[in-house]
Amino acid sequence: MIIVLKQDAPDVQVREFCHELEDMGLQINDSKGSDTHILGLIGDTKAIAESWVLANPVVETCRRVSEPYKKANRKFHPDDSVVDVEGVKIGGGNFAVIAGPCSIESEEQITYCAQRVKAAGASLLRGGAFKPRTSPYSFQGMRSEGLDLLKLARRATGAPIVTEIMNTEHLPLFENVDLIQVGARNMQNFELLKAVGRQKKPVLLKRGLANTLEEFVMSAEYIMAEGNENVILCERGIRTFETSMRNTLDLAGVVMLHKMTHLPVVVDPSHACGHAWMVPELAKAAVAAGADGLMIEVHNDPAKAKCDGAQSLTPDQFDELMGFIRKEVEFFGKKMN
């Protein structure tokens, strides 16, 4: 249930009303925007009569919500959420680009890529240390050593770092990571979602290969229900009958997610197609669809990359793309971070 309070409702009376609701065993998601003050009730509200709610002098109106997600629901929180990653803001009119190699291969490689993407305008540095691969014989990443190299690249550039966590046992290793990524294959790893929800670092949650938008948002709800509401959603393409591309980018899903939820939505055009030549056009389309950011793979020598070289841009290609993206973001009235 959503309760809209009167703008001039006295704080004392609002607190008293909230205490009454909490005494009924309900959790309250209190969202105060520029024009509205909303109480989102989480729990069993079937026994609460709307007439009883409306009789309270602080209440403007109320309505029941059918969606299973509450904290992530835009009806509970009408204003866009802004997630701050070490000073880089994403959402609410703020646009950020995350860039870097799919996997960390050496200190020289990650440092060079970091310096180039930062100079081109990327706000955050990505780099895979733990790699979930389809084949057990493929490169699995440099693991904890890779994390150390990623931190060195952060020191060299000042850019906050983003990397993927594979399981709950790795969480202590991620204390110095600025934005923790939960990958597509772990989107419904509920124990991992709860674990990252219990810590305070922002979380980048990628959509699963064959998950609906509601399932995607419900995974974000798992994180938020544990107390961490700094969640960024990432559309990275879904599996369809089409075989000419690695995945199919769901740009309609980006638009729909902004209607469903107040959380920021970024797009990964690299994984969405699997072809570097397609990445620039998909990135431009994502901005036009209202994305709050991009996540792009950049490698100094894609032909020799140990992971996903075919979808990685060179630093020069990324430079050229960023020149266009910067103008496009400005055209659509967003602020480039």
Residues covered by each model-derived region:
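Non-catalytic terminal accessory/regulatory regions of metabolic enzymes
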Residues: 1-97
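Catalytic beta/alpha-barrel core
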Residues: 6, 142, 158-169, 178-191, ...
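Short, well-ordered coil/turn segments that N-cap beta-strands
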Residues: 93-95, 121-123, 155-161, 176-178, ...
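Catalytic alpha/beta core domains of metabolic enzymes, predominantly
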Residues: 199-298
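Active-site mouth loops of central-metabolism enzymes
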Residues: 95-112, 135-140, 160-164, 183-185, ...
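Glycine-rich, proline-tolerant flexible connector loops at the mouths of alpha/beta enzymes
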Residues: 126-144, 299-310
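Conserved, mostly hydrophobic/aromatic
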Residues: 53, 100, 125, 174, ...
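Alpha-helix-loop-beta-strand connector modules within alpha/beta enzyme cores
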Residues: 139-163, 195-202, 251-265, 311-333
